[in-house]
């Protein structure tokens, strides 16, 4: 993230007046929010590769892993709680393609991820929330030009 900021700053001659705080969060790095026991889950990643592993994860078919909805809700709550409170704030969360692929599949209600679905290098997901409390909020997202939304409360009920 720091190198991305440095690169953006060096692309203009104008003095930048922004102040950007970088906060590292364990939920956004591998193994991230989804793994409960790396010793149980790790061999499946090695055997299946990234695409196979994420497909098994979104089907809730791996030992040592959270339920897919629970893992995704944890990441969404982190994003909700760390978003700047002013109207002009923007958060940039940097993660791995595996985590992004899982989040997109789960919030989209899909239990299969194809190679075409896989996030490309530097491809991003734009998310925002409407509502004053996370559990009562509505998640809205844009992925590859398509706008989607879901109720966090209703989404959590799907885990049961």
Model-derived regions: residue spans:
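Terminal low-complexity/intrinsically disordered segments and their adjoining alpha-helical capping regions
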Residues: 1-160
């Amino acid at each position: 993230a720091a190198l991305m900021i440095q690169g953006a700053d060096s692309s203009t001659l104008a003095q930048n007046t922004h102040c950007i705080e970088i906060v590292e969060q364990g939920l956004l790095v591998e193994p991230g929010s989804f793994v409960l026991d790396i010793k149980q889950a790790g061999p499946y990643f090695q055997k299946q590769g990234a695409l196979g592993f994420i497909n098994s994860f979104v089907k809730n078919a791996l030992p040592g892993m959270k339920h897919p909805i629970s893992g995704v809700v944890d990441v969404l709550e982190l994003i909700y709680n760390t978003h700047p409170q002013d109207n002009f704030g923007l958060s940039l969360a940097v993660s791995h393609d595996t985590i992004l692929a899982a989040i997109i599949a789960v919030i989209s209600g899909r239990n299969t991820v194809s190679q075409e679905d896989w996030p490309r290098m530097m491809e991003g997901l734009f998310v925002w929330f409407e509502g004053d409390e996370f559990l009562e909020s509505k998640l809205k997202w844009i992925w590859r030009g398509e706008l989607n939304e879901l109720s966090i409360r209703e989404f959590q009920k799907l885990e049961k």
